[in-house]
């Protein structure tokens, strides 16, 4: 079967012996364009089988099958006997012989044998045989003018490699020319196969043919499909590769040779006159193509593709109902291509043939209405056994197939031949495309080796880190390749820092928005994109002289803790040799004690915070996190460099106190893992001696001496919870160090070594560079702990930068930080989701780069952090997934990558906040106080409200000019907007952008009683987070978002869970941003985002439209409402003209006012603009659009109008009642559960304010 047919979805022939009849799609005949044309063949289907359709439309110019004057066709080399073909074949009668009705030139004719005529041994049923013309016999028709015709070389002449399909050839190889290899089954054989392929010579006219085996018997000479052809057809011969039953054989008849009669079941295009000499007809099912006379008059309309066959056979003989046209005859002098794409032939059913129709009927256009009942027979005859054609395109120029046709064949078919080959190669490329995609991840996995050399860059002198900021901006590519860095990080740390080598993968551009989403298997590739890029790149050095300053810590909003001014001693920049890698901030506090970050490699003081009694932490015991040594190989897989942090603190009150650390990195000294835990005296405040950071080549996880307690959960250096050797209550999953153990918590964790958003002035990005900290000059920055706490929502892990979900450690931690810090991320991972309150040095000069120091804000409320046990209980459970996703989306499961880190560290390939920072982002902007200023113009680049393993892409780089909207949303549903969020640019209130997995802030329950657990982030939630990001960005244009676009850009392979993900995204929008996703077009599934919190009067859409445009919109909406909810366009324009606004102006305040109203507002769905029916010329009217219904209300508009007129809204009683009714309905609608409102309540809207 031709490959062309395979492209169309047809079944391919059996690979071995012929099988029972297979019914495939009908023959598609290709109508060849003129030989001089390169246009592809035009497939056409025959008229319907009802045979009542007129063929008038199908008529084509009648080709004249005669050679140009004075030119005779070249003689053709006689063909030898092919193996195993039917009985003796008698040549057709000479041209001009007695033929009752001359057939149409170019029409395939099969003459039925007269009743009682001797039957030759029946060849394989369904074989189409055409006798070749005798050598020297005049061609029935010459090739198109200009076709070089030369005598084919004698059989056996070696043939050069045939030109590619479509290349005209001077002469075809003679039959029997050795061919190198035949094309695969289904390859159109329009062009001769390469030399070397043995070709059986078609038999010369009259050559007796061997008896074929019965139908279904495999034939000796034809190989099974896929093997080299034993008999590649000579040019002009249509031969199936295996001459199994149903093979078409075309042999040009020699002029003057008696025509072999076709079998009774043969499909006949012309009844043979009774006077024609009849030869022994071939067996049943053989289709004999007989050449018509050279200049036979046309008594029937030319069959332009529609088979005009008329069965003529004795009634006693069965005939095969021709279900498909046999050939399409092209216009004059162009090759006729018989394109059998998926032709299937089987032994024709024994259908008794009706009386022979008179030939005259063929002259009428409705030639399909042959009286013969055979034409109404079931469509079976030709659809039985699949024909495995090696040459699906047989091109001949005359019914008497001449061997000189190939030249035109190559000219005519080229359109056809180029067509199918592209089609055939097409599918293979398509099938090969997936492999390419599957190979993409390996490419990504190979990239990391380049980065393995990068860690040294990060473990270098402070100067290196000063260069990091630019590096961070260029992180995205580096991030994907970071994992290997982590794998070799500990060894690199133990070694002397190699010379800094700038990472080659420094991309200055940030990945575009949602396009940063990984490819469809994004979450599996994500593992390789979860590392802070800074570790891989070195940036230009920017030496800074950090001045010593004191930073008055501004009290955080929300639950607060007294925060005295913290003196920040100045520390000189580290010297390169002394620089050691200090992991990210890690805190450990006894249960009920404020978490105390202890690991800041710069000179920083952590001010102790006297918490208010209401928010006091009650230390009930001092459980510990015990770091169990891991196998060396496992530790090697873990990214964090091995850095021992010896706890030199003198102690701290077990409760209500945050420790103050002063860690000048330059004082790093070697200290063993046996750092003892000094007791924490109850001092109001104290200065801790410099912590000693040691990078030692000890075991990956050096056991440190901590106070052993009933730690509910232990952290592996990679940050996962492990079952404690003391407390064995954990499940077996918790006790495993296998990848399964790391797999579960990954999605649940929002860790990035300090990817905790901080104002730009705080140089938050640097805080995310754990490896770089050791090189940062310590600028005096103090961070007072903040007590602002946001309740966690079970189904929505907030996009706060530090929402540590899953195995985040709880307040049940050692009173001090004596354990060795193995992973800069593990440290952060061990933190519960408590707010980080960055309070940068406001007085630091611009020259000094703010040290990315963060203090783990001691959550003031007891419920601010979940216990380690609680937090880890869910962390070890695999994230919830739909069954379908679980089966299909294995790449979405949190799996252990080659470094032993869970994907949580580098779960998303999207831009990280540090990737967007330039050098200026790392500098304190000015002495102005920006300690809590999340509205800082450059803050968006320094923070990311969704920074989590699964949401780092959501808002990083997506924040608008003001990031407050991206941050204020992460208060829990019950938290007010004012809870620690300041939207004024100069605000000194630290913004708390984190959610604590705990009960609401109002609860005073202790941690033991707090059972709220952070749930793992399922793949659907990850997609929902990405969808939220996508929607927020798309909403800036105020244009509805199509569901199909969401699926294409974000959901991808999760389109089956599309509605579920959209609902989750809607819930996140409501909880986080106060927005709501509404479906405004249920037919096209278009969505918009509205402000669910409602707008204050006069502030309807001012956030998106400037005041003038907003006023114009309100005027138009109010006019529409007052005029009966529908106003003609001219009335609105006239009204605006009376107000002094000429809509024809294009340079006014609104620019093109008419375009603004009729296009922009309409596109944004504030207005609906429709034509008034039956108006000529067309007139249009305006109505409220769906967005107007959702974002405002009639009552608001009425109040707006009343305010303009200085009246009471009730001055318009009718409109007031209408607006009031709408308000009541909205109130009723709002009373329903919000979950039911989801994203599919196109008409629900918030109550008016």
Curated annotation (Swiss-Prot):
It comes from the Eukaryota. Residues 1226-1235 have a biased composition (Acidic residues). It is found in: Early endosome; Cytoplasm; Nucleus. Its main location: other. One of its GO terms (biological process) is negative regulation of DNA-templated transcription. Residues 40-49, 140-233, 312-324, 349-358, 410-432, 553-567 have a biased composition (Pro residues). The keyword Nucleus applies. Disulfide bonds: none annotated. Expressed in placenta, fetal and adult brain. Not detected in heart and small intestine, very low levels in fibroblasts. Not expressed in brain of a Prader-Willi patient. GO terms for cellular component: cytosol; early endosome; endosome; nucleus. It is linked to Schaaf-Yang syndrome: A disease characterized by clinical features of Prader-Willi syndrome, including neonatal hypotonia with poor suck, feeding problems in infancy, obesity, developmental delay, short stature, and hypogonadism. Additionally, patients manifest autism spectrum disorder. Some patients have dysmorphic facial features. Probably enhances ubiquitin ligase activity of RING-type zinc finger-containing E3 ubiquitin-protein ligases, possibly through recruitment and/or stabilization of the Ubl-conjugating enzyme (E2) at the E3:substrate complex. Acts as a regulator of retrograde transport via its interaction with VPS35. Recruited to retromer-containing endosomes and promotes the formation of 'Lys-63'-linked polyubiquitin chains at 'Lys-220' of WASHC1 together with TRIM27, leading to promote endosomal F-actin assembly. Imprinted, expressed from the paternal chromosome only. Part of a complex consisting of MAGEL2, TRIM27 and USP7; directly interacts with USP7. Interacts with TRIM27. Interacts with VPS35; leading to recruitment at retromer-containing endosomes. Interacts with BMAL1 and PER2. This is MAGE-like protein 2. It comes from Homo sapiens. The gene is MAGEL2.
């Amino acid at each position: 079967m031709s490959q062309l047919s395979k492209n169309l979805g047809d079944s391919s022939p059996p690979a071995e012996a012929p099988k029972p009849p297979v019914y495939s799609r009908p023959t598609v005949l290709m109508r060849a364009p003129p030989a001089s044309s390169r246009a592809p063949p035009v497939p056409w289907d025959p008229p319907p089988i009802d045979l009542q359709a007129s063929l008038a439309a199908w008529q084509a110019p009648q080709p004249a099958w005669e050679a140009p004057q004075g030119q005779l066709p070249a003689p053709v080399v006689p063909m030898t006997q092919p193996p195993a073909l039917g009985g003796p074949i008698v040549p057709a009668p000479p041209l001009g012989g007695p033929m009752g009705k001359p057939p149409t030139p170019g029409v395939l004719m099969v003459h039925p044998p007269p009743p009682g005529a001797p039957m030759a041994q029946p060849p394989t049923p369904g074989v189409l045989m055409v006798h070749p013309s005798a050598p020297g016999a005049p061609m029935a028709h010459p090739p198109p003018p200009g076709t070089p015709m030369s005598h084919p070389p004698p059989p056996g002449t070696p043939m050069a490699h045939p030109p590619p399909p479509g290349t005209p050839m001077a002469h075809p190889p003679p039959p029997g020319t050795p061919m190198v290899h035949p094309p695969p089954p289904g390859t159109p054989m329009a062009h001769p196969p390469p030399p070397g392929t043995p070709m059986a010579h078609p038999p010369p006219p009259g050559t007796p043919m061997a008896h074929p085996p019965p139908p279904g018997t495999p034939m000796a000479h034809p190989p099974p499909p896929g093997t080299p052809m034993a008999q590649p057809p000579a040019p002009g011969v249509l031969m199936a590769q295996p001459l199994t039953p149903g093979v078409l054989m075309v042999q040009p008849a020699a002029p003057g040779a008696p025509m072999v009669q076709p079998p009774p079941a043969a499909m006949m295009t012309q009844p043979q006159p009774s006077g024609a000499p009849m030869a022994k007809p071939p067996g049943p099912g053989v289709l004999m193509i007989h050449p018509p006379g050279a200049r036979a008059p046309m008594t029937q309309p030319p069959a332009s593709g529609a088979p005009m066959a008329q069965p003529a056979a004795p009634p006693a003989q069965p005939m095969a109902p021709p279900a498909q046209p046999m050939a399409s005859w092209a216009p004059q002098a162009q090759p006729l291509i018989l394109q059998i794409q998926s032709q299937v032939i089987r032994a024709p059913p024994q259908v008794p043939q009706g009386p022979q129709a008179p030939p005259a009927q063929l002259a009428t256009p409705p030639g399909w209405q042959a009286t013969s009942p055979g034409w109404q027979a079931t469509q079976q005859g030709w659809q039985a056994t699949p024909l495995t054609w090696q040459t699906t395109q047989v091109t001949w120029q005359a019914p008497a197939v001449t061997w000189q046709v190939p030249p035109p064949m190559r000219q005519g078919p080229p359109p056809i031949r180029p067509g199918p080959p592209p089609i055939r190669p097409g599918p293979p490329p398509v099938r090969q495309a997936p492999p390419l995609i599957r190979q993409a991840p390996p490419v990504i996995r190979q990239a990391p080796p380049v980065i393995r050399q990068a860690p040294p860059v990060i473990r270098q002198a402070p100067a290196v880190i000063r260069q990091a900021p630019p590096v961070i901006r260029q992180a995205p590519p580096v991030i994907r390749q970071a994992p290997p860095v982590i794998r070799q990080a500990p060894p690199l740390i133990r070694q002397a820092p190699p010379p800094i080598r700038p990472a080659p993968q420094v991309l200055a551009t940030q990945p575009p928005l949602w396009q940063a989403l990984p490819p469809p298997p994004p979450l599996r590739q994500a593992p390789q994109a979860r590392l802070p890029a800074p570790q891989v790149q070195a940036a230009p050095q920017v030496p800074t002289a950090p001045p010593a300053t004191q930073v008055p810590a501004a009290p955080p909003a929300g639950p607060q803790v007294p925060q005295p001014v913290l003196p920040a001693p100045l520390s000189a920049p580290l010297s390169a040799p002394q620089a050691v890698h200090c992991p990210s901030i890690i805190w450990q506090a006894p249960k009920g004690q404020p978490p105390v970050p202890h690991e800041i490699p710069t000179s920083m003081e952590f001010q102790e915070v006297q918490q208010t009694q209401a928010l006091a932490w009650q230390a009930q015991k001092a459980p510990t996190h015990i770091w169990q040594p891991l196998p060396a190989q496992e530790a090697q897989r873990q990214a964090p460099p091995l850095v021992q942090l010896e706890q030199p603190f003198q102690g701290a009150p077990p409760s209500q106190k945050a420790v103050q650390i002063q860690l000048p990195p330059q004082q790093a000294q070697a200290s063993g893992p046996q750092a003892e835990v000094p007791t924490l005296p109850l001092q109001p405040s104290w200065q801790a001696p410099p912590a000693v950071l040691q990078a030692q080549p000890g075991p990956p996880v050096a056991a440190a001496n901590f106070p052993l307690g009933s730690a509910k959960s232990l952290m592996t250096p990679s940050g996962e919870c492990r079952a404690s050797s003391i407390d064995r209550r954990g499940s077996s999953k918790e006790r495993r160090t296998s990848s399964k153990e790391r797999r579960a918590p990954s999605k649940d964790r929002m860790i990035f070594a300090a990817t905790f958003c901080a104002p730009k002035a705080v140089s938050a990005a640097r805080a995310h560079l754990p490896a770089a900290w050791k090189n940062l000059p310590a600028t005096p920055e103090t961070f007072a702990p903040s007590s602002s706490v946001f309740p966690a929502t079970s189904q929505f892990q907030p996009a706060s930068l530090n929402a540590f979900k899953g195995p985040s450690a709880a307040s049940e931690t050692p009173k001090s930080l004596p354990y060795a810090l193995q992973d800069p991320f593990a440290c952060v991972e061990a933190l519960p989701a408590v707010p980080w309150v960055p309070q940068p040095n406001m007085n630091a000069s611009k020259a000094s780069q703010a040290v990315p120091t963060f203090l783990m804000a001691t959550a003031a409320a007891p419920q601010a952090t979940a216990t380690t046990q609680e937090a880890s209980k869910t962390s070890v459970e695999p994230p919830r997934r739909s069954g379908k996703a679980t089966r299909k989306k294995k790449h979405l499961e949190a799996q252990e990558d080659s470094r032993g880190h869970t994907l949580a560290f580098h779960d998303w390939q999207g831009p990280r906040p540090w990737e967007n920072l330039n050098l200026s982002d790392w500098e304190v902007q000015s002495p102005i106080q920006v300690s809590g200023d999340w509205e800082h113009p450059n803050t968006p680049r320094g923070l990311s409200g969704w920074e989590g393993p699964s949401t780092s892409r959501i808002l990083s780089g997506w924040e608008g000019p003001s990031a407050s909207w991206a941050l204020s949303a992460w208060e829990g549903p019950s938290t007010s907007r004012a809870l620690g969020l300041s939207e004024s640019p100069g605000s000194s209130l630290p913004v708390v952008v984190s959610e604590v997995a705990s009960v609401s802030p109002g609860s005073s329950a202790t941690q033991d009683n707090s059972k709220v657990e952070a749930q793992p982030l399922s793949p659907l939630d990850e997609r929902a987070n990405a969808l939220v990001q996508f929607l927020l960005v798309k909403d800036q244009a105020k244009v509805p978002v199509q569901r199909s676009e969401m699926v294409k850009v974000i959901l991808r392979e999760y389109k089956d869970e599309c509605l579920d993900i959209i609902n989750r995204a809607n819930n996140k929008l409501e909880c986080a941003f106060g927005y709501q996703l509404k479906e405004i077009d249920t037919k096209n599934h278009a969505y918009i985002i509205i402000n669910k919190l409602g707008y204050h009067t006069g502030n309807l859409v001012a956030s998106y439209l400037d005041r003038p445009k907003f006023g114009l919109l309100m005027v138009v909406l109010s006019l529409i409402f007052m005029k009966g909810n529908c106003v003609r366009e001219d009335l609105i324009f006239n009204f605006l003209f009376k107000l002094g606004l000429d809509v024809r102006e294009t340079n006014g305040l609104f620019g093109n006012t008419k375009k603004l109203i009729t296009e922009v507002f309409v596109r944004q769905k504030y207005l609906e603009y429709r034509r008034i029916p039956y108006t000529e010329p067309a007139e249009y009217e305006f109505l409220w659009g769906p967005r107007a219904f959702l974002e405002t209300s009639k009552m608001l508009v009425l109040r707006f109008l009343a305010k303009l007129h200085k009246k009471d809204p009730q001055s318009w009683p009718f409109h007031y009642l209408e607006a009031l009714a709408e308000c009541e309905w909205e109130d009723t609608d709002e009373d329903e559960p919000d979950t039911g409102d989801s994203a599919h309540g196109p008409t629900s809207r918030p109550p008016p304010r």
